[in-house]
Amino acid sequence: EFTLFGETIRPIISDINVGLLFVLSVGAIGMYGPLLAGMSSNNKYSLLGAARAVSQLLSFEVVSGLSILAPIMIVGSLSLVDINNYQGDSVFDWLIFSQPVAFLLFLIAGFAETNRTPFDLLEHEAEIVSGYITEYSGLKWGMFFIGEYANMFSISFIISIVFFGGFNSIGFIPGGIAILLKVAFFIF
């Protein structure tokens, strides 16, 4: 909850008890995009790039799934609201302080899943054959990068909610602005 112009706002559409598992599983479906793009382009280099992309995405999904288990075991719930409320008392209750190794593993896996440096080998722009998007240009090429940036936002929100207190206010900064600042920090 946060207050905006005197009104208390609860920015929750639905509080499902397996919310974090649902978000991670929907994110894992994203590996079908590169696989189907490489297969449907009818190019052997795109198919090899798709196989490379799927193997990298699958390997880092395992790391991100296992690293998120430590905060889940501390909180005792998969609900994103419960994880947020667990860290609500002060900044020192954030799970980054009790689980720094899990945070680093999840951060590295998040960088790898979103193709950020140094894990941008899947469609590196300096290569002539740029992975599974070799045959795509224009709007289709742009849709892959819109999806990549949407994945960056979702990973940043997960990191902010699970490890950095979520929607809880930081001192004089209200909760809604605080989470946007945290997400912006991890995106840039």
Question: Which residues are covered by each model-predicted region?
Answer:
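Selective transmembrane helix interface/packing segments
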Residues: 1-188
